[in-house]
């Protein structure tokens, strides 16, 4: 597993379903995120079990991501047509509803490979999350095994920590939350 933190986020152009439901044949990650914060959110497959719980939870937090200037892109190996069918399936019938973020179709597995999150076997993405700054640099990454769902509160906390650090130049100690004091990086300790 590669560590991408501190490196330029791999770019990609693939078919996708945008947050407004529009299907596009050529979604460009770099064009959509230029000058913005971004979260790239890998998940194994549409129409499965843990995945809808994560994607619905992610959508429930979209106002918080949007207010922080964060573009959210979900990625799986499913086609854009399958993504669209899943969006159009009611939640009580196994769907995710009209989520408000882009769903990219990594049908060739190239994005999974570039971000080094492909689980082989079975050839699907691990649950990888990448927080990318406005310069396109990966600042945080976490990769969960297939049965382990993610916590959206922690993802929002990491966005807040990155933005706090960029604004104030201070670091964020363990357990830091928005509104808490930061600290100066110092060899004298805490």
Question: Residue spans of the language-model regions?
Answer:
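Chalcogenol-based redox active-site neighborhoods
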Residues: 1-190
């Amino acid at each position: 597993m590669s560590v991408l933190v501190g490196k330029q986020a791999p770019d990609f152009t693939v078919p996708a379903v945008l947050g407004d439901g529009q299907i596009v044949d050529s979604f460009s990650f770099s064009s959509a995120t230029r000058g913005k914060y971004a979260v790239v959110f890998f998940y194994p497959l549409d129409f499965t079990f843990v995945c809808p719980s994560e994607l619905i939870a992610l959508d429930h937090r979209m106002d918080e991501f949007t207010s922080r200037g964060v573009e959210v892109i979900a990625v799986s190996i499913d086609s854009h047509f399958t993504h669209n069918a899943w969006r159009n399936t009611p939640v009580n019938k196994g769907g995710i509803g009209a989520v408000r973020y882009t769903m990219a179709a990594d049908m060739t597995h190239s994005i999974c490979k570039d971000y080094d999150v492909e689980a082989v076997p079975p050839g699907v993405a691990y649950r990888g999350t990448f927080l990318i700054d406005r310069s396109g640099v990966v600042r945080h990454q976490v990769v969960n095994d297939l049965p382990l769902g993610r916590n959206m509160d922690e993802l929002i906390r990491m966005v807040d920590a990155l933005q706090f650090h960029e604004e104030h130049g201070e670091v964020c100690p363990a357990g830091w939350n928005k509104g808490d004091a930061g600290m100066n990086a110092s060899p004298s300790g805490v």
